[in-house]
């Protein structure tokens, strides 16, 4: 029986033939001759002996009849794969189906080995990842970080060249020096938007977006893979939180909040020049020039035709449905957009996913928007150009237009929320529970948080193909903050033990005009920091919580190499989640005022009825849910700020009920870089 961990080796060196050594220790797959492509059939064994020497491990691949893979092979191996293209999603769907239906790990390994050298490498990675996440016999395996397998999605082409040079010239891994990523490679200070480079081009931020769409695919052969609990609502909330965080960073950098891209006929003022090459396509990611205008896309090669008029029509139909309070399914039956399921239904319509009740009527608004922008430089394939970064889930967040587009998408969801009745004081109050005070403490400072720059390494060697083996480190400069802790004083004046759900949010106190922010604006900038359950016996007591325990983030070591434990494996079971180092906004050198909000709601009202089993993936549940389980909160995502405030609550202080509290927190930024000590050169 095959060791299922060997499946992880199939992700390594994605453009090299499958029979080449994998895993960094000379492991090779003993591939049946009928599985080897015609080009290498006669030389396979000779190449294995040459590149692996005395290889340590030989993985036997069982020869089985191979299912029809022709659908998934329609996309060439050197072409660009995009989840935003429906034709590509269907190809991936077919391959996922093949992988899912293999009855044993042995047979899954066999068909995956066969497919690997015949299917587009990124499509293969995506399909095998989704299948392994959803098969009962492989879902406990930790997938390798996407950045380690396809580093070209996360670093510029010059850095890639330098890493290849370091790998080729310096034979011993221990003697190789990290290759530094420049912080100024996509634009100069003349570009105002470049002030946000540390957010848009952050490794962890882009990995989060890719991994979320991996965990929540919008198309799959088995509907249950897509139809996860509150999936559409999660699409709304996760992206809404990205926009809230982005707007906070804009205020930190003396910039106005992002303007939604409402008029598709207006030029896109911001250009973007990614400076990245696709190793699979052997092409540069195309740039987009300032003031580019969108036009209808007609690309038969991509089975793609979408017009601006289509987008307008879908938008108007969605707005009409929101105002009517219902959508129509494919049989013209009404589905009510109520205050519980409405947002979930809209999420699947607007994205749109396989769960949309009527794609013919409501279209494919979000996905096609990405495509219109991604092909704006070559909408008819006249110049044989591939999509820009907006066409790939792992690169889209690098582009300033991503945030304008998603601000527009978020406005659709907010229009639905405006139709709902505001929460009353009774809805918000937790009888007999009072939050008496809150404070945060960091490095001996109270209610003051500090950010700075930090250098961290990622081993990219598994994605560097056709170069000598051994570790090759990429060194990134990223935002970081000192860890902090919350102290919450709570009083339970009843005579019984109560269970509370602590909800912590952060939002700027002042708007871009330096005026106190009205709650209707501020609620959309409320960034969720944490959510957890507490037990409250009668009387007063203190709740403490560390920032590293956040329910929205994944641990730092899951984004970057842990320098204290360099031998720690880089495969991680639960890669979905906001990066811990980006938990709080950057702030300003002189300090910037934020309001920290804490609410303790009644957990008896909020809890979800499901068995209290240990969940393998319980981190980052706020943005990513729980694997194979219901979302762990009955309230609407973003509660209590997902609806308009009640009358008389124009400011946050007037919104508060006794079980809430808010304080001012100052976030300061220190313009220093915490560097990693350079290792001595033993070459």
Curated annotation (Swiss-Prot):
Location of the protein in the cell: Secreted
Q: Which organism is it from?
A: Drosophila erecta (Fruit fly)
What is catalyzed by this enzyme? Answer: 2 L-dopa + O2 = 2 L-dopaquinone + 2 H2O; L-tyrosine + O2 = L-dopaquinone + H2O
Residues bound to Cu cation A: 209, 213, 239
The cysteines covalently paired via disulfide bonds are 574-617, 576-624
Primary localization class, coarse? secreted
Query: This chain belongs to which protein, by name?
Result: Phenoloxidase 3
Residues that bind Cu cation B: 366, 370, 406
Q: Which GO terms describe its cellular component?
A: extracellular region
Report the co-factor binding details: Binds 2 copper ions per subunit.
> What is an example of a GO molecular function annotated in this UniProt entry?
tyrosinase activity
State the needed cofactors, names only: Cu(2+)
Q: Propeptide at which positions?
A: 1-48
| Keyword Glycoprotein listed | yes
């Amino acid at each position: 029986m095959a060791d299922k961990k060997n499946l992880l080796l199939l992700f390594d060196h994605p453009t090299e033939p499958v029979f080449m050594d994998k895993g960094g220790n000379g492991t090779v797959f003993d591939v049946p001759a009928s599985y080897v492509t015609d080009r290498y059939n006669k030389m396979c064994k000779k190449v294995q002996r040459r590149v692996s020497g005395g290889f340590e491990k030989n993985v036997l691949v069982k020869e089985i009849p191979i299912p029809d893979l022709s659908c998934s092979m329609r996309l060439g191996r050197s072409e660009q794969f995009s989840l935003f293209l429906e034709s590509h999603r269907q190809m991936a769907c077919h391959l996922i189906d093949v992988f899912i239906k293999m009855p044993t790990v042995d047979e899954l390994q066999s068909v995956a080995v066969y497919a690997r050298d015949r299917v587009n490498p990124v499509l293969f990675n995506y399909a095998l990842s989704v299948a392994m996440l959803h098969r009962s016999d492989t879902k406990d395996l930790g997938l390798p970080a996407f950045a380690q397998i396809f580093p070209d999605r996360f670093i510029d082409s010059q850095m890639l060249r330098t890493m290849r040079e370091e790998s080729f010239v310096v034979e011993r891994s221990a003697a190789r020096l990290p290759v530094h990523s420049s912080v100024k490679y996509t634009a100069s200070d003349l570009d105002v938007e470049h002030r946000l480079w540390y957010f848009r081009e952050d490794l962890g931020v882009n990995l989060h977006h890719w991994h979320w769409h991996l965990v929540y695919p919008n198309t799959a052969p088995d509907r249950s893979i897509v139809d996860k609990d509150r999936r559409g609502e999660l699409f709304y909330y996760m992206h809404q939180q990205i926009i809230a965080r982005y707007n906070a960073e804009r205020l930190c950098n003396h910039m106005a909040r992002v303007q939604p891209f409402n008029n598709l006929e207006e030029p896109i003022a911001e250009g973007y020049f990614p400076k990245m090459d696709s190793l699979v396509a052997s092409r540069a990611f195309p740039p987009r020039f300032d003031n580019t205008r969108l036009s209808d896309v007609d690309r038969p090669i991509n089975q793609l035709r979408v017009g601006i008029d289509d987008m307008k029509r879908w938008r108007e139909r969605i707005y009409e449905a929101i105002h009517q309070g219902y959508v129509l399914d494919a049989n013209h039956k009404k589905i009510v957009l109520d205050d519980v399921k409405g947002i979930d239904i809209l999420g699947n319509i607007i994205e749109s996913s396989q769960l949309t009740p009527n794609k013919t009527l409501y279209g494919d608004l979000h996905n096609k928007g990405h495509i219109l922008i991604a092909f704006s430089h070559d909408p008819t394939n006249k110049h044989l150009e591939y999509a820009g970064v907006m066409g790939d889930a792992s690169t889209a967040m690098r582009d300033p237009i991503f945030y304008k587009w998603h601000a527009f998408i978020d406005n659709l969801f907010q229009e639905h929320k405006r139709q709902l009745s505001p929460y009353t004081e009774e809805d918000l109050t937790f009888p007999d529970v009072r939050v008496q005070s809150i404070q945060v403490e960091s490095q001996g400072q109270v209610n003051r948080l500090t950010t700075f720059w930090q250098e961290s390494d990622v081993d990219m060697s598994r994605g560097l193909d056709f170069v000598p083996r051994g570790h090759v480190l990429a060194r990134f400069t990223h935002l970081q903050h000192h860890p902090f802790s919350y102290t919450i004083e709570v009083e339970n004046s009843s005579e019984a033990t109560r269970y509370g759900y602590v909800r912590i949010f952060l939002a700027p106190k002042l708007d871009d005009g330096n005026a106190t922010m009205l709650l209707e604006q501020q609620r959309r900038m409320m960034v969720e920091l944490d959510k957890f359950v507490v037990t409250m016996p009668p009387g007063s007591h203190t709740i403490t919580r560390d920032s590293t325990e956040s329910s929205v983030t994944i641990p730092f070591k899951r984004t970057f190499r842990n320098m204290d434990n360099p031998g720690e494996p880089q495969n991680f079971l639960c890669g979905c989640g906001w990066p811990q180092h980006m938990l709080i906004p950057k702030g300003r050198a002189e300090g910037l005022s934020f309001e920290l909000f804490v609410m303790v709601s009644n957990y008896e009202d909020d809890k979800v009825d499901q068995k209290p089993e240990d969940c393998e993936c319980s981190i980052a549940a706020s943005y990513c849910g729980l694997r194979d389980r219901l979302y762990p909160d009955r309230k609407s995502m973003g509660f209590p700020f997902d609806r308009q405030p009640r009358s008389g609550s124009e400011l946050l202080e007037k919104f508060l009920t006794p079980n809430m509290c808010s304080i001012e927190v100052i976030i300061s930024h220190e313009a220093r870089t915490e560097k990693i000590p350079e290792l001595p050169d033993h070459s």
